[in-house]
Structure formats: C-alpha cells, structure tokens
Design a protein with these regions (language model features):
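Solvent-exposed loop/turn segments at secondary-structure junctions
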Residues: 11, 17-21, 73-74, 99-101, ...
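Extracellular ligand-binding/catalytic regions of CAZymes and related secreted enzymes
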Residues: 100-105, 112-156
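A glycine-rich, often tryptophan-bearing local segment used as a flexible ligand/cofactor-contacting loop or short
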Residues: 1-66
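Catalytic beta-strand/loop cores that center a nucleophilic Ser/Cys/Thr
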Residues: 44-117
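Aromatic side chains
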Residues: 4, 19-21, 37, 46, ...
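Structural recognition of the beta-strand scaffold that forms the well-ordered cores
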Residues: 5, 10-15, 22, 68-69, ...
C-alpha cells in the first residue's frame, strides 16, 4: 500500500479502513501497523463512533465536487455515525452526518496524499449499499480518484 500511494495511485477507504492499521500493538502475526494512516492518508481522525441504532441523516456540504455529481437531496444511513472530527488540514468534507442530540460529523471527504487522490467515507453499513445515493457516491469516488469524468445524472 505504501508503494502504491508513493507512486501517486488513488485510494478509496470505506468505513473501518480508518482504523484498519491501528492494532494498538495487538495485531496478529504479519499485521503491518500504520497508526497514522487515518490522519496522514485518509485525512481523518477516527476516535470512535456513536451507538448503532439512531438513523444517520446525510447532507451535502457542497454541490460543486465531482464526487457528489448526480446525488440529489439528503439521504439516510442505518450504520453507526463515526466521529472523525476534526479532519486533517487539507481534507475536503463533502457529506455530513447527524443523529439526534449529537453534533454533525463528516461522513465523506477527499484528501491528497503526495500525488495520490484519496476518497474516504465512514458510510458503508450493509444497508447503505441498497441506497442509490450511496452507490452513486461510490461510483463517483472511483471516477474522481482515477481521473475519469463524473456521472452527470442520478441513477434510479
């Protein structure tokens, strides 16, 4: 992964990718630790999540980014809302999530790691994959990180 990123190749991180390399010294044999991966590469600051249960409302922070092309209106997620704030300097938040009684948190953003384009989302609960907005988000993320043109219309 380090060589991939050093070569300027893109990366998409979903959900638990934010803490995949931080085993806190408890990793299995052969596990490579990279405790700074979340902040350095993804641009996040994962420090836990809210309890599963409340539905997360997801809204755009901007309509002008190619990753958001064709995504109309707010949508919801049944997954636990992650707490990645504050994002690293240089990360660009695209979507914010909120649950009742808690502050909003970024749930999708872009970052640059060297020459590598990076997209991360804390969404990705199994039910999210049934959402047309989430599927469009992921398609757009692939297109943006790889330099392809974005979709121009929402999918049914």
């Amino acid at each position: 992964l380090r060589a991939h990123l050093a070569a300027g190749k893109p990366l998409i991180g979903v959900r638990t990718a934010s803490h995949a390399f931080d085993a806190r010294g408890q990793g299995p044999k052969g596990h490579a630790e990279w405790p700074g991966f979340d902040a350095e590469v993804l641009g996040g600051n994962y420090h836990g999540h809210h309890p599963t249960g409340p539905t997360t409302s997801v809204v755009s922070t901007t309509a002008r980014h190619p990753v958001l092309a064709g995504i109309s209106g707010p949508f919801t997620s049944k997954g636990a809302l992650y707490m990645p704030s504050p994002l690293a300097k240089g990360a660009t938040p695209l979507l914010m999530g909120s649950i009742p009684g808690k502050k909003s948190e970024p749930v999708a953003w872009t970052n640059q790691f060297g020459k590598a384009r990076v997209f991360y989302t804390s969404l990705g609960h199994e039910s999210d994959f049934r959402s047309p907005q989430f599927r469009q988000l992921m398609e757009n993320a692939v297109r943006w990180t790889t330099g392809m043109k974005s979709a121009v219309a929402a999918r049914p």
